[in-house]
């Protein structure tokens, strides 16, 4: 660790059990992928994710890719809800040490303001019923069977409207917001403000994801983000990358989806303790410049 706990930002390269390292506060990785997403490891099964989370001390992990039919089928068969918490555990697991939260990343490509827009959005579902209803709608109108992270010809505000029409506690927020090609603030196809991206649905956006190429200190420089909850997650495409970025929350002994949702929605800084950060300098999009001229700013 190169920075003290009081700065609420961790930077690390080598780690073993984060739960022990962080004095047993809950580590949440809210953005990962399955073996069905493009360029992702075939080892990303629910059983392997559970085991890796136990090894690393990750308490709550995203399922990723719940819109992909084969993966959703695995989720339904291999996971079971813990009470009525909206969190899930592996059926064959010995205990509830690792809890799964239903999530997916959607790639939205559409036109707005006379420009082509490409934005990746995180969607977290409150339960299987809500996720299934969203899947059924998307399967009727879009192709969700070609990739774990499907491409939809839908706008950001329309997605928010759709999710909230199914269940009011869907959590929708922009992923890796600075990525140039597929992000809310992307230089190639993004927007200049949160409001420009989400229009009349902006009031329902409660968070944003930093992405690997930026850290909290960089994002805190933009005042329009001040009212939103900053989240950092791994976007893992393989097991070793789980929790390379993550969030550390102070949760109850028996956490629920609703507890996590409310903490993020209200930006409860008493419960959001800090994030675990990858070195942003190693992110693909950290520096500006011109590769052909060997110039980096």
Regions found by a protein language model. Name each.
Residues 51-71, 171-173, 207:
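Divalent metal-dependent hydrolysis catalytic cores, especially in the metallo-beta-lactamase
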Residues 228-243:
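Short acidic/histidine-rich active-site segments
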Residues 31-35, 67, 176, 237:
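Histidine-centered divalent metal-coordination motifs
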Residues 25, 73-206:
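Extended substrate/RNA-proximal surfaces in nucleic-acid metabolism proteins
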Residues 11-20:
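Short, positively charged and aromatic/hydrophobic N-terminal segments
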Residues 38-40, 72-76, 182-189, 220-221, ...:
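Histidine/acidic-residue-rich catalytic or RNA/ligand-binding cores of hydrolases
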Residues 272-297:
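Cys/His-rich short segments
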């Amino acid at each position: 660790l190169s920075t003290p706990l009081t700065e609420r930002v961790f930077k690390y390269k080598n780690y073993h059990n984060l739960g022990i390292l962080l004095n047993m506060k809950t580590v949440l990785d809210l953005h990962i992928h399955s073996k069905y997403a493009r360029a992702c490891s075939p080892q990303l099964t629910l059983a392997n994710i559970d085991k890796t989370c136990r090894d690393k001390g990750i308490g709550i992990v995203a399922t990723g890719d719940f819109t992909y039919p084969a993966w959703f089928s695995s989720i339904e068969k291999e996971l079971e809800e813990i009470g009525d918490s909206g969190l899930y555990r592996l059926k064959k697991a010995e205990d509830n040490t690792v809890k799964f939260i239903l999530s997916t990343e959607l790639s939205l490509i559409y036109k707005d303001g006379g420009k082509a827009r490409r934005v990746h959005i995180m969607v977290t579902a409150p339960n299987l019923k809500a996720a299934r209803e969203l899947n059924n709608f998307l399967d009727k109108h879009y192709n969700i069977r070609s990739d774990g992270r499907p491409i939809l010809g839908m706008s950001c505000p329309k997605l928010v409207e759709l999710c909230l029409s199914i269940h009011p506690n869907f959590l929708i927020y922009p992923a890796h917001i600075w990525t140039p090609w597929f992000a809310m603030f992307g230089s190639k196809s993004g927007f200049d403000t949160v409001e420009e991206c989400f229009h009349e649905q902006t009031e329902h956006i409660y968070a944003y994801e930093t992405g690997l190429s930026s850290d909290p200190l960089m994002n805190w420089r933009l005042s329009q983000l001040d009212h939103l909850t900053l989240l950092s997650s791994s976007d893992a495409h393989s097991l070793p990358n789980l929790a390379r970025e993550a969030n550390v929350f102070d949760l109850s002994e028996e956490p629920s989806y609703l507890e996590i949702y409310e903490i993020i929605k209200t930006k409860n800084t008493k419960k959001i303790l800090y994030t675990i950060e990858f070195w942003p300098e190693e992110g693909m999009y950290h520096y500006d410049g011109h590769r052909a001229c060997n110039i980096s700013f």
